[in-house]
Amino acid sequence: MLQVPELPDTDPEETAEWRDAFLALVATQGPERARHLLQELARLARSQRVGWQPGLNTPYVNTVGVQEQGVFPGDLAIEERLGSIIRWNALAMVVRANQAYGELGGHIASYASAADLFESGFNHFFRAREGLGAGQHRGDLVFFQPHSAPGVYARAFLEGRLSEQDLMHYRQELTAPTVGAHGLSSYPHPWLMPDFWQFPTGSMGIGPISSIYHARFMRYLTHRNLLDCAGRKVWGVFGDGEMDEPESTSALTLASREGLDNLVWVVNCNLQRLDGPVRGNGRIIDELERLFAGAGWNVIKLVWGSDWDGLFARDLTGALARALEGTVDGQMQTFAAKDGRFNRDNFFGQNPELAALAQGMTDEQIDRLKRGGHDLVKIHAAYAAASAHKGQPTVILAHTKKGYGMGTSGQGKMTTHSQKKLDGADLIEFRNRFNLPLTDEQATGLAFYKPAEDSAEMQYLRRHRQPLGGYLPRRETACEALPVPPITSYAQFALQADGKEMSTTMAFVRMLTGLLKDAMLGPRIVPIVADEARTFGMANLFKQIGIYSSVGQRYAPEDIGSVLAYREALDGQILEEGISEAGAIASWTAAATSYSVHGLAMLPFYIYYSMFGFQRVGDAIWAAADQRARGFLLGATSGRTTLGGEGLQHQDGTSHLVAATIPNCKAYDPAYAGEMAVIVDAGMREMVTEQRDVFYYVTLMNENYAQPDLPEGAAEGVLRGCYIFDSWRRLSDKRERPISSKNVTLLGSGAILTEVVKAAELLTAEGLEVTVLSVTSWSELARDGQACEQRALAGEAAPGVPWVTQQLAETRGPVIAATDYVRAVPESVRAFIPPGRRYLTLGTDGFGRSDTRAALREFFGVDAQSVAKAARFALQNGGA
């Protein structure tokens, strides 16, 4: 049992007088006056340095009292029957799949604990999109606990959106189409079910942080007068164990700071994670109450069901409240796993007062005492209170039993999370527990059950969803396409750079500044930074377009007279996320999926230190890809040697390797501003005009060097991954290419292309004929080559020739490839080098160092001398 320390009472008589006076105050002047006096006393205690502060925990009872819960607006009996049917179909779906194929997996216990939390939302609160017209509700955003996906499928089956064949192919996405069915993904995956799921939540922690930044982005849209999101909510149903993920709780203070009363979390506190109790020796609800209250959230505890109301009313001595306060979660889990007789003896049998409360109750009645998260009346009261609350985000801490209703096979068991098979007796017990109209044969045969279309249950289900906008989850894609301005309107300086020195980061910021001025596209651009705008030369945008702030700017900034003044504004356009890459990528995802979530296309540009992208928040980027995000990720200060002095933790040599693993990510490493202009133009057209489900990753460098004009006809090669770059066109003396019998081909990308060009000049001076290719995307070249291979393997008559093979066919000699990334990046195209050509790769494998660029490039062997040395080696050792 939990020991709660208390200060000794040195004067009980005086204490009683204070207590009586306070009770009289509440009775005569009401709770508002009582709260005011308590606040005054707390202020006085602080001023007198008493050393006391109010505790963040409230009694272990429901926040919404019986007198405040209102009248339940639904038909409780029908809703309970519907819930029981959905529970059964969810269970049958998982057990069927695992009886047929034991390796498929799935979860029964999570949805069993959350079913009523879901159903109350579906029947009364979760609003679907009515349409995109004026006055039409654009829908709530609902993040579903991933392990409860079977329950969502089971409800969609009753709604007629999924067939019995679909349910029979749970987790069989490849097999299902062969029999005309839709395979159901394991968890919410928009990529796999693009008309169904909106938000991927399968990776713990990603859903919670995403929900916060989606709620904030809705305020951003409203405050910038782009879309009125009033009346829309973001609901998130998450697990208590999931709250241990850093991403789950890292943005709690942002939600309260922004006053996001459009955000409601429901934390399913079933007290169990995969291996055992979440807090066996403590109480997770108390811990989460302190956490959320301290972070400034409105906390609603949903602990006990209606069956407990009479017990609390009769608890005149406080024995029940004290016993519950002293029971740790590990013991509470044991009570959930045991029957009524055990609970009578071990809980109510602790003392005579508790025993008296249970007198007259049967063991079955004790066994059926519901926790708050299983009582539809209490859930509705909590949801209604959360929906009405203003000024703060709300969290509902719902007490449930994991595996609720699974009886001795699963309820409260340590192993219940992985339970996916039940025997005949267990199935019949489940049927009986929920009064399902199934024969023994149907129950043991795992027959799906769907009431007749004209039944009271089906009519009720439809009648309650209709005023809420229809069924959900439902992912929409209807969105107006955006025109993209001509490339010359914002990037002419890059296309015709004429040898001017600048970094590609500087060039990008100049392009972005031009794009922001476009009347059509400009307002839809969302610049996002994680406290690095000044590093990237973007400070001029502070004054030009402002930094978004939900309260405007309540102070005069120190630099108010400067052209670079730090200007915050209610309608500011920049999302300045502070030192939070997790928050910044969540904001980027919210903007990059706005076309689907809100029916409004937005174009986010998130610029960051490239090392702190895929390496730091790769899981969030993967989830964004699953969600079919559209936008730009700009990995600035990229390259292991280009960043120079920052050293091991900051120098990126791997981001392009990771980016290549994401199927809908197009990754580019342009060396020159003209190349980048072509890439940005193509990306915008592909994402907001053609509306394709891709996003772009472009690396930018902070090294200043001469920028050549983009060669005529190079655009196709830039986009496909490489083109022949003739370095002689940049030479001031207009020399002709020398004629030689010795040939070598050099490939380079990013800032290392400048070293490759220098190497070409060194080799040319030695009498070699050198061709230089600028590689803008190793991953696009590799994918193109792999696609040709796949077509050939499939027996297609014209599988095509890989682009890199075509380009190299116009060159001769061994091929040397150099990058500022690990060698695995250029190695990805080895299979597509023309037969008989020697291929050597140079890269920056290993940890970074702090030094000058020249020293770093020499150390890693990617400077001009090293590239030239590799070329000589290849020629001397039989290179073709």
Describe the function of each predicted region.
Residues 236-237, 265, 528, 634, ...:
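Residue-level marker for buried hydrophobic side chains located in beta-strands
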Residues 4, 21-24, 71-79, 97-106, ...:
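Glycine- and acidic
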Residues 236-239, 243, 619-640, 645:
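A structural-propensity feature for long, helix-poor, extended segments
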Residues 74-86, 90-100, 107-258, 281-282, ...:
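Cofactor-binding active-site loop characterized by glycine-rich and histidine/acidic residues
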Residues 130, 218-228, 593-613, 632, ...:
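Glycine-rich phosphate/pyrophosphate-binding loops
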Residues 2-159, 163, 430, 502-518, ...:
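N-terminal amphipathic, basic-rich helices that act as targeting or association modules
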Residues 176-200, 206, 220-231, 249-445, ...:
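Thiamine diphosphate
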Residues 72-90, 111, 129-134, 455-630, ...:
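Non-catalytic terminal/interface segments that mediate subunit docking, oligomerization
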